[in-house]
Amino acid sequence: MGSSSGQKPRRLEDLVDKLASGSLSHSRLEKELGNANEAALVRRLYLERLTGASLSSVASTILDFQELYGRNIENPIGAVQVPVGVAGPLRINGDYARGDFYIPLATTEGALVASVNRGAKAITLSGGARAKVIKDGMTRAPLLWTPSVYEAHRLAMWVEDRIEDLRSVVAGVTRHGRLQHIYPYIIGNLVWLRLSFSTGDAMGMNMVTISSDRICRYIEENYDGDAKCIALSGNMCTDKKPAAINKILGRGKYVVAEAVIKGEVVKNVLKTTPQNINLVNVTKNLLGSAAAGSHSFNAHFANIIAAIFIATGQDAAQVVESSMGYTWTEVRGEDLYISVTLPSLEVGTVGGGTRLPTQRELLALLGVAGGGNPPGSNALKLAEIIASAVLAGELNLLSAIAAGQLARAHELLGRGGLKIS
């Protein structure tokens, strides 16, 4: 027993030596050891020896890399931690999200949780937020080559005429997704096929990518003209990049959240007036964004979306397009109407990072962990919750700017000004 336990550290040190000499690659460690957790340890030991840095905090994690390797991570060395706070309760009156919710926000930005919290209070005191998903469809846009514009146009018509055949192709790939629409777009002799899919409770990028690949194969094998797929993603999807097409046609969940904030709540909680909030929104979010050439006509959608994405295991890179959208305000008598529109909110409750234990717990906190009943309902509920949280964040920031409170809030909460004792 003693000799075998002594052999194990020696073997790990031997593997560190092999990494250092270049005779073993990091990508082969799991196969060499048969254990992803031990492979992570060896990588840390190697990196500590190489750089002199201590990775003891990175090593401190509840994650089991045996469960994650090959699904969520390659070459693991540990994990990072981000503080999580909650804002709420936030009352939501949506088609799927109904009730009072505490919103988990993973962030290192002081004042963000407090900002959403005050906005949530104002919304809840005014009866709650209404939320609705207008459209739901994840997109992928393969790019096909043809020899001429005439062939490109013929291909586009051929594809549109065979949408039922293509739906059958997709049905053979997944039981959770369905091909909804095809939008052909022609430039010269090239054809983009913007394919839109329903994806159930998954965000769906893996599903739509595999389905799009099968569609391209079907076209190449069955089209009676000259066409070749040259890129499975032709950037008209558009994934992880700001793009007007996502704002116009939507990608993921096209969702709106709105509320009418009572005049006395604006005065007593937000410390300003509906007129001042409306003025800031029109001049800052609308005119200022237009003058800057921004794709986003809002104050800080990305703050809230990034914090919830990290907390709930969404694809953090998709904050780029998910945070594009519009904040709209109107003065209605003594009250303030405010809405946020997010045309391309890309979220899911199964797959990807939603499998991680801490993220799954926070999805459960919101009542959306795993698949919904009926299928797709949990992802729609999560979209309504996120949009309502964004509404709370926008309402508070516009109010803080209108009341001249923004700098003071960051001095107090973002620079260590708030003390427990």
From Swiss-Prot:
Record's keyword annotation contains Acetylation: no
Catalysed conversion reaction: (R)-mevalonate + 2 NADP(+) + CoA = (3S)-3-hydroxy-3-methylglutaryl-CoA + 2 NADPH + 2 H(+)
Any Pfam family the entry gives: HMG-CoA_red
Pathway of action: Metabolic intermediate biosynthesis; (R)-mevalonate biosynthesis; (R)-mevalonate from acetyl-CoA: step 3/3
CDD domains: HMG-CoA_reductase_classI (cd00643)
Annotated EC: 1.1.1.34
UniProtKB keywords: Isoprene biosynthesis, NADP, Oxidoreductase
PROSITE patterns cross-referenced by the UniProt entry: HMG_COA_REDUCTASE_1 (PS00066), HMG_COA_REDUCTASE_2 (PS00318), HMG_COA_REDUCTASE_4 (PS50065)
GO molecular function: hydroxymethylglutaryl-CoA reductase (NADPH) activity
Active site, renumbered: E109, K240, D315, H410
Gene Ontology BP term (one): isoprenoid biosynthetic process
KW Metal-binding (keyword) present: no
Enzyme class: oxidoreductase
Function: Converts HMG-CoA to mevalonate.
Similarity field: Belongs to the HMG-CoA reductase family.
Name the record gives this protein: 3-hydroxy-3-methylglutaryl-coenzyme A reductase
Organism: Aeropyrum pernix (strain ATCC 700893 / DSM 11879 / JCM 9820 / NBRC 100138 / K1)
Designated gene of the protein: hmgA
